[in-house]
Amino acid sequence: MTNASEMPRKLTILGSTGSIGTNTLDVVRQLGGRDGFEIMALTGAGNIALLAEQAREFGAQLAVTADDDKYEALKSALAGTGIKVAAGMAGLEEAASMDAGWVMAAIAGTPGLAPTLTAARRGADIALANKECLVSAGDVFLRTVKQGGGRLIPVDSEHSAIFQCLTGEYKQAVERIVLTASGGPFRTWSRDEMSNVTADIARAHPNWSMGLKVSIGSASMFNKGLEMIEAKYLFDLRPDQVDVIVHPQSIIHSMVGYTDGSYIAQLGSPDMRTAISYALTYPERGNLSVERLDFAKLARLDFEAPDEARFPALRLARMALERGGLQGAALNAAEETAFHAFVAGGIGFLDMAEIVETVMDRMHDGRTAETMDDVFSADEEARRHALELIATKEKAA
């Protein structure tokens, strides 16, 4: 970090054993380790050995496993260290409640909602990697952040890029934002070719190193659809101001178009640690060891319009934006449920979008989210509908 007077920053990482979490800790190492950050709490799911190793290395005050059944294993792994151990939702809430000025919200899926909201309520600055907070509960979540008084710094490379491109600019001068998408491993595949795709094939991303959920979301472009909804809330945009362009090289991470016809873009190597570092050091920048761009070797940068016929996730995301209400929650919960069924081999790759659209149509009734209870209720309903549709497809197969 560039300003030692603010060191160390107190940091809690919700989801330290996942892809974002492990990269966050690598950034912490590069930015001074314990001299740069005081790790208050680390949370993980089933990888107890890694969680315990992280807690010991960084001297965390609290280590939490989200799995109640893994409590004794974690307690045993950290015996004699003086590190407090907790488990389950109560443990996640305790971690989010600790006196950390910065919280990395990296628990994937709906389970990350409650602890992230807890951190927001107490006024922590949130480095947001959890998409569900905005996709499912956008208005409610933003209201909570505002009331708590903390800042919201995006961690997704695309939203981090937009955030940086907007710095120092007039909001009224923004004409549109353009999120870039690599196109994933199936960018040039036909729907017939995609019909027989397995999870192992879908997880192989051409540019980025990511976890299973995000990798498959990139292949289906549901990940980009969720990012469209996130962008609307993060930057207070109309649905028609959010665009997507396919950029196979993943060098331009996103851009902002202004009313005078100019564009500002953020470029960099496809390494999520850059956006993580920016979120953890904002408004400064850290000294990070990542691959630098060599512009002389960048022979070309390609762009193409996304094909929504082959990748309907983008159309469904725009539909959720235009309909509003609880459609984001319905899309997210249905997609998450369909993803698990696809990974388990119960449905095909193309079935995911079909299931999501059917669930969204069933729940298109004008309801809005006034409280988190409304969001959780919609989430539960969407999952129930999705499971019914999945069961029908499994039976037919």
Curated annotation (Swiss-Prot):
Catalytic reaction equation(s): 2-C-methyl-D-erythritol 4-phosphate + NADP(+) = 1-deoxy-D-xylulose 5-phosphate + NADPH + H(+)
EC number of this enzyme: 1.1.1.267
Coiled-coil stretches noted in the UniProt entry, renumbered to this chain: none
Example GO molecular function: NADPH binding
InterPro entries, A to Z: DXP_reductoisomerase, DXP_reductoisomerase_C, DXP_reductoisomerase_N, DXPR_C, DXPR_C_sf, NAD(P)-bd_dom_sf
Cofactor(s) in the UniProt record: Mg(2+); Mn(2+)
Key words, A-Z: Isoprene biosynthesis, Manganese, Metal-binding, NADP, Oxidoreductase
Residues binding NADPH: 17-20, 45, 47, 130, 132, 211
Annotated residues for binding of Mn(2+): 156, 158, 227
Record-listed 1-deoxy-D-xylulose 5-phosphate binding positions: 131, 157-158, 182, 205, 218, 223-224, 227
GO BP annotations listed: isopentenyl diphosphate biosynthetic process, methylerythritol 4-phosphate pathway involved in terpenoid biosynthetic process
Pfam families named in the record: DXP_redisom_C (PF08436), DXP_reductoisom (PF02670), DXPR_C (PF13288)
Known pathway: Isoprenoid biosynthesis; isopentenyl diphosphate biosynthesis via DXP pathway; isopentenyl diphosphate from 1-deoxy-D-xylulose 5-phosphate: step 1/6
Assigned protein family: Belongs to the DXR family.
Function: Catalyzes the NADPH-dependent rearrangement and reduction of 1-deoxy-D-xylulose-5-phosphate (DXP) to 2-C-methyl-D-erythritol 4-phosphate (MEP).
Name of the protein: 1-deoxy-D-xylulose 5-phosphate reductoisomerase
Gene, per the UniProt record: dxr
